[in-house]
């Protein structure tokens, strides 16, 4: 017999008794945050609503995989993204797993083996070459912070570093007492040694413009340095006005502001410069494997997304140049 579900004063269906019990367990036993708990509540309400539509004659705990697949198909048909459906399936799977430990009648998890449809990969945003040059060259001011910001921008664009990798850089390799640099700049060799994701180390060359910008920054770095700084800050390549290692959030905020000052009409953040580096390198060289190594991707599949961007560039050139492709 299916358990009846009442309707609350606002016309919404009250939670299935076992869903209500599960939500209480998440709240009081697992102590999930209110935001996460709200997400579970929403996804399980969808399960209950769709269960009533697709299997009204059985209790929610007795749903089978074919019910779940039909419900997923409805969500997909309603326009939900693969990511949103995957989030719903995850919440449903958790509830059925919890139920299986408490109810002998629940002998299998109907969500196991059900996979959400894949969402199309979102292509990363990249600046045009002209926009990248403007961001590098049209930043007004000659104070220490502005000189530092120019060096930050140039290094991002020259090396394609992740934000976490850039802030971890020291001025040089240091091993003093308990402190040892994880990542560092070797200005003389014109390269950076980076400890990236998965503790994978790589060497990335630094271009001429970035080398010049870094030299200019190192010449004024002492203006922001503090004599009593801890080793973590004393050896940092980039400093805040308080003499601390420059924080990721500070870089993000200043880059956004500096982009506006440089007249770059784009939502610029550090990862946009990493994407721009990869896209422009691939357009110039066509060497996907080299770009993979420079970016520090463990798999070539992560780098292949840039081939789509490169094809867009080639298609645009084709449309502009081919006599039979030009729009009249």
Curated annotation (Swiss-Prot):
GO biological process assignments: cell division; chromosome segregation; DNA transposition
Keyword Cytoplasm among record annotations: yes
GO MF entries: DNA binding; tyrosine-based site-specific recombinase activity
Key words of the record: Cell cycle, Cell division, Chromosome partition, Cytoplasm, DNA integration, DNA recombination, DNA-binding
Main location class: cytoplasm
Residues the record marks as active site: 162, 197, 271, 274, 297, 306
InterPro entries: CB (IPR044068), DNA_brk_join_enz (IPR011010), Integrase-like_cat_sf (IPR013762), Integrase_catalytic (IPR002104), Integrase_recombinase_N (IPR010998), Integrase_SAM-like_N (IPR004107), Recomb_XerC (IPR011931), Tyrosine_recombinase_XerC/XerD (IPR023009)
GO CC list: cytoplasm
CDD domains in UniProt: INT_XerDC_C
Pfam families: Phage_int_SAM_1, Phage_integrase
Residue stretches making up the Tyr recombinase domain: 122-319
Coiled-coil ranges (or none): none
Subcellular location: Cytoplasm
Annotated Core-binding (CB) domain residues: 13-100
Oligomer status and interactors: Forms a cyclic heterotetrameric complex composed of two molecules of XerC and two molecules of XerD.
Family: Belongs to the 'phage' integrase family. XerC subfamily.
Functional summary from the UniProt entry: Site-specific tyrosine recombinase, which acts by catalyzing the cutting and rejoining of the recombining DNA molecules. The XerC-XerD complex is essential to convert dimers of the bacterial chromosome into monomers to permit their segregation at cell division. It also contributes to the segregational stability of plasmids.
Protein name: Tyrosine recombinase XerC
Gene: xerC
């Amino acid at each position: 017999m299916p358990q009846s579900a009442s309707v609350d004063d606002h016309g919404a269906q009250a939670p299935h008794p076992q869903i209500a019990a599960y939500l209480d367990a998440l709240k009081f036993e697992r102590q999930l945050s209110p935001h996460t708990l709200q997400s579970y509540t929403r996804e399980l309400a969808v399960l209950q609503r769709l269960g009533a539509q697709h299997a009204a004659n059985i209790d929610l705990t007795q749903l089978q995989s074919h019910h779940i697949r039909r419900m997923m198909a409805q969500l997909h048909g309603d326009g939900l993204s693969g990511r949103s459906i995957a989030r719903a399936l995850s919440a449903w799977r958790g509830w059925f797993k919890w139920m299986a430990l408490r109810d002998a009648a629940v002998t299998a998890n109907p969500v196991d083996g059900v996979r959400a449809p894949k969402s199309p990969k979102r292509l990363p945003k990249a600046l045009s070459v002209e926009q990248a040059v403007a961001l590098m060259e049209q930043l007004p001011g000659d104070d220490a912070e502005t000189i530092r910001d120019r060096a930050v921008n140039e290094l991002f664009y020259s090396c394609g570093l992740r934000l976490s990798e850039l802030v971890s850089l020291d001025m040089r390799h240091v091993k003093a007492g308990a402190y040892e640099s994880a990542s560092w700049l070797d200005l003389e060799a014109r390269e950076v040694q980076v400890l990236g994701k998965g503790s994978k180390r790589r060497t990335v060359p630094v271009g001429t413009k970035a080398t010049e910008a870094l030299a200019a920054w190192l010449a004024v770095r002492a203006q922001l340095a503090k004599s009593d700084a801890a080793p973590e800050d004393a050896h940092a390549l980039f400093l805040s006005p308080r003499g601390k290692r420059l924080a990721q959030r500070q870089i993000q905020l200043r880059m956004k502001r500096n982009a506006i000052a440089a007249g770059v009409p784009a939502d610029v953040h550090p990862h946009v410069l990493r994407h721009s580096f990869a896209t422009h390198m691939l357009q110039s060289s066509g060497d996907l494997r080299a770009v993979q190594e420079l970016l520090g991707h463990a798999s070539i599949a992560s780098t292949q997304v840039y081939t789509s961007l490169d094809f867009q560039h080639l298609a645009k050139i084709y449309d502009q140049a081919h006599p039979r492709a030009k729009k009249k």
